Swiss-Prot record:
EC top class named in words: transferase
Cofactor note as given: Binds 1 Mg(2+) ion per subunit. Binds 1 thiamine pyrophosphate per subunit.
Gene for this chain: dxs
Source organism phylogeny: Bacteria, Bacillati, Bacillota, Bacilli, Bacillales
Cofactor(s) essential for the protein: Mg(2+); thiamine diphosphate
Entry binding sites for thiamine diphosphate: H72, G113, H114, S115, G145, A146, N173, Y283, E366
Assigned GO CC terms: cytosol
Name by which UniProt lists this protein: 1-deoxy-D-xylulose-5-phosphate synthase
């Protein structure tokens, strides 16, 4: 079948299992070919082809609400709802999103990008349905990794207590991004391999139904079956919560899927259908991935699966940070690394393998990761939490209440700080400055290159006190030479890279390379700018700011982050609080979410490019001369 001709999922109801198998193959071929060009979350999607098709065959979207947790596994859903023709633009600027989007299709009823939200959203939709006396099915689809998230467990507790009618799909592929960890994962493993319980339940029901008055006997046998399940399966977690359990179901068998889903619709109250799938199914490089490399990636060679490399000069920032921290940890057993299910993305797999006693993957549990680190710091350890900026948002209260308020020495490596590109608004790392800098004890830094990162990391562990956040971007470094011996860096001390007389430009991180290029262009036009590496976002360099105020020249701040509550706002507030008349111009992200696309195009949109910076600086210089 030409999947680009699909307009809506209604045609699925008339297809035989054999025809559905053919459609599965066509969709897999389409996805593998398209993602080889665009990149994307190919592994997760290849694993849920049959499951997604079965859901659309049994349920009636958009009347019935299909709620995809995280949302990166919705490519098949997008194809079945008429968006296959747009896959050439997947995750590209102004193109098809890699996640559900309300403005793309009426079939996308919930947006997500972070995990473990689907069950709470489903509970809300189901309650809205019941209160308004409407009639539709609510079907959240959540992975076994996401189900370990605290928010998902909170929702399960409420759903089971309230007996709210819904069908929960547990997509069990034994992985979130990396292999899953924890007691919940182990429980799923026991359920996965224990078909005896469900076979026994079915046999009892069938036997009793054939006897006179069998329905009454079947009802009275509930206690027997309850005892049986504890004998056969080591703990039926969901049924103890008040949620009926169906499974495990082969997630690549249309017959089993359809039977299970139809059964779930006939049961009153909440039901969980435990579906076993194979992440990456149908494409050997993805199917054989044991550590999560094929969860999400860039373009690759179709024939071999080899990921196409860019022309980067240095290692990735993530790799540099993890290698540097590991080099410290090898000599200092009080350093331990903690990550919330991101050992692959944060490049900690080598650390995990070589220093297993000092490494902790806590699963999709950002709040737990942060407070666990606080507990370690309170007892003499130097914990390092490697976490994406976007996921750190989920642990705000733990940062404030448990770490900062107690002034505990936890070092945070904030990965993917700034614009991240293709994953879009749910993943842009542009909010952390705003919510970290108002924490009284927090130090926030961002290095200009790898060598400075080395020195700042050393100082973070051995020179500074209290909580430390070191931001670093997605992508690769510059390949600069690293000093052999770390230097002390005075906390709050900025670095003047180039002196100038017309405008002072304050920035940090990779933006400084752009500003240095702008400086060269402006020198040709007779405009002299002072370029300052404001590597400490908090505390500010108050000595420099005081001296700058006396020079009576304008200040431009440039940040790949939100302006509200950001670095530039801190500069403006500082001068305002002191009643100093300093002209401060800020460039950054206005009060909006930044969608997906190439980072260079997104930077153009927010005005962080050579042409706009030259224009803004010249305007500042001219207005200052005229004043």
């Amino acid at each position: 079948m030409d999947v680009t001709k699909i307009k809506d999922p209604s045609f699925l109801k008339d297809l035989s299992y054999e025809e559905l198998d053919g459609l599965s193959q066509d969709i897999r071929t389409f996805l593998i070919e398209k993602c080889a060009v665009t990149g994307g979350h190919i592994g997760a999607n290849l694993g849920v082809v049959e499951l997604t098709i079965a859901l659309h065959k049994v349920f009636n979207s958009p009347k019935d609400k299909l709620i995809f947790d995280v949302g990166h596994q919705t490519y098949i859903h997008k194809i079945l709802t008429g968006r296959a023709e747009q896959f050439d633009t997947l995750r590209q600027y102004k193109g098809l999103s890699g996640f559900p989007k309300l403005n793309e299709s009426e079939h996308d009823v919930w947006e997500a990008g972070h995990s473990s939200t689907s069950l709470s959203a489903a509970m809300g939709m189901a309650k809205a349905r019941d209160i308004q006396q409407q009639h539709y099915e609510v079907v959240p689809i959540i992975g076994d990794g996401a189900l370990t998230g605290g928010m998902a467990l909170e929702a399960l507790n409420h759903i089971g207590h309230d007996k709210t009618n819904m069908t929960i799909i547990l997509n069990d592929n034994e992985m979130s991004i990396a292999p899953n960890v924890g007691a919940m994962h182990n429980m799923f493993g026991r359920l996965r391999t224990n078909s005896n319980y469900n076979r026994a339940k079915s046999d009892i029901d069938l036997f009793l139904s054939k006897l006179p008055g069998g329905h009454k006997l079947r009802d009275s046998a509930d206690r027997v079956k309850d005892s049986l399940k504890y004998l056969v399966v080591n703990g039926i977690f969901f049924e103890e919560l008040g949620i009926k359990y169906i499974g495990p179901v082969d997630g690549h068998s249309y017959k089993e899927l359809e039977e299970a889903l139809l059964t779930s619709k006939r049961i009153d109250g909440p039901v969980i259908v435990h579906v076993i799938t194979k992440k990456g199914k149908g494409y050997h490089p993805a199917e054989n991935d044991k550590i999560g490399t094929w969860h999400g990636l860039g373009p690759y060679k179709l024939e071999t699966g080899e990921v196409l490399k860019g022309s980067a000069q240095g290692p990735s920032w993530s790799q540099f940070f993890s290698d540097t921290v590991q080099s410290f940890a090898e000599r200092d057993k009080t350093i331990a690394a903690i990550t919330p299910a991101m050992p692959v993305g944060s490049k900690l797999t080598k650390f995990q393998k070589e220093l297993p006693q000092q490494f902790f993957d806590v699963g999709i549990a950002e709040q737990h990761a942060v407070t666990m680190a606080a507990g370690m710091a309170a007892n003499g350890m130097k914990p390092y939490v490697a976490i994406y900026s976007t996921f750190l948002q989920r642990a705000y209260d733990q940062m404030l209440h448990d770490v900062d308020r107690q002034n505990l020495h936890v070092v945070f490596g904030i990965d993917r700080s700034g614009l991240v590109g293709a994953d879009g608004e749910t993943h842009q790392g542009v909010f952390d400055i705003s919510f970290l800098t108002h924490m009284p004890n927090m130090t926030v830094m961002m290095p200009k290159d790898e060598n400075e990162a080395y020195h700042l990391l050393y100082n973070a562990f051995y020179e500074y006190e209290g909580p430390i956040a070191i931001r670093y971007p997605r992508g690769n470094g510059y390949g600069v030479k690293i000093d052999s011996i770390p230097n002390s860096v005075v906390r709050g001390d900025w670095e003047v890279l180039h002196e100038g007389t017309d405008v002072i430009v304050l920035s940090f991180g990779p933006t400084l390379k752009l500003i240095e290029a702008v400086r060269e262009e402006l020198l040709k036009e007779g405009v002299s700018i002072e370029v300052v590496n404001a590597r400490f976002i908090k505390p500010l360099d108050y000595h420099y700011l005081a001296a700058a105020a006396k020079r009576n020249i304008p200040v431009l701040t440039v940040e790949e982050a939100m302006l509200s509550g950001g670095f530039g706002a801190a500069i403006s507030n500082h001068y305002s609080d002191l009643d100093l008349d300093v002209h401060v111009k800020r460039i950054g992200i206005d009060d909006e979410y930044i969608e997906h696309g190439d980072v260079s195009m997104l930077l153009d949109d927010i005005g962080i490019n050579k042409a706009n910076l030259i224009h803004e600086i010249k305007q500042l210089a001219i207005s200052h001369e005229e004043s």
